[in-house]
Amino acid sequence: MEIVSDKKISEKGIASAAELLYKGAKMLAHSCPECKMPLFEKDGKIFCPSCGREVVIEEDSAAKAESEEKPPESTKPAVKADYDEAVEKIEMAISKVCDMMVESRSVEEVRVLSDSLEKLVDALKKLRE
């Protein structure tokens, strides 16, 4: 597991990500260039749930040309990799929320974190079904 940034992912960002997964948004393998939170896609838009920034992902021209020349291979391994990455990111978020709950001194904060944790666990269960 690689830590991409020293910045702490905000509680609001985690709750927002959990809610998006619950509502059917797709977590992407790319992260926000600003806050390093995983990007999400919903209704054809790619955005960061933490900072609300809409993002455009560009392929480099060499990779694009190569993909146009090659006939499409089976997408099963790519789908499996995306699935595994989504599961791993949700598990990381669950771990971070648990750590935040342990460190919390506020009952209200624990309640909010508990709600976020419940949504993340539900999303993980749905992915594994």
Curated annotation (Swiss-Prot):
It comes from the Archaea. Pfam families: Auto_anti-p27. Belongs to the UPF0148 family. Residues 61-80 are annotated as: Disordered. This is UPF0148 protein AF_2370. InterPro entries: SSSCA1, UPF0148, UPF0148_domain. HAMAP family: UPF0148.
